Amino acid sequence: MNIFRFLGDISHLSAIIILLLKIWKSRSCAGISGKSQLLFAIVFTTRYLDLFTNFISFYNTSMKVVYVASSYATVWMIYSKFKATYDGNHDTFRVEFLIVPTAILSFLVNHDFTPLEILWTFSIYLESVAILPQLFMVSKTGEAETITSHYLFALGIYRTLYLFNWIWRYQFEEFFDLIAIVAGLVQTVLYCDFFYLYITKVLKGKKLSLPA
Amino acid sequence: EVLPGDHDEL
């Protein structure tokens, strides 16, 4: 464990909690892409199948449980509890264009051709593009609530910090995982546009609005 | 290079 990875995990956990609280407190999921949250639930499910078979540490197991439980809770709130506030007309990204290519790629490029390893690889590839429906929805509505932009910023920063974690681990642990690094780079690049808007607007107290 | 199955990151 190193500071970048720890801060990354904290940032990721913060994003998940921010979203849960935003929906629960405001009793509304307006502006939130249910499709992205569905994809995140798939990402955690396919990545943590070894939750009960491969114990690494208490921290690792407890964080995995929190991630899986909160992602399912978020999906449940969007598609069931507060589905009346779900803005389906603006959440129109074709997720099959994300799931199919990443599934095919996980069969072609992986560390080991075994079910668990292919599912782990699929989850890494899917995570790198899972935010696209949400970013697409923000660009379609032309704006995002400030709390939603804080959620997106925390979520984007988590994988950016993981990039520094991989530099650290390559330097000091001779560890590198090209699949995770390349997917992490793609994931971070997808946030660049949003990071620019967040830093130039939201941090100056303005509302996040995209040129429609 | 990481060995398959020993993914210790979240």
UniProtKB/Swiss-Prot annotation, chain A:
Residue numbers on the Lumenal membrane side: 1-4, 53-58, 111-116, 169-178
GO cellular component, one term: endoplasmic reticulum
Keyword Protein transport included in the entry's annotation: yes
Region (Interaction with the K-D-E-L motif on target proteins): 47-48, 159-169
Residues spanning the membrane: 5-24, 33-52, 59-79, 93-110, 117-135, 150-168, 179-199
Function: Receptor for the C-terminal sequence motif K-D-E-L that is present on endoplasmic reticulum resident proteins and that mediates their recycling from the Golgi back to the endoplasmic reticulum.
Protein name: ER lumen protein-retaining receptor 1-B
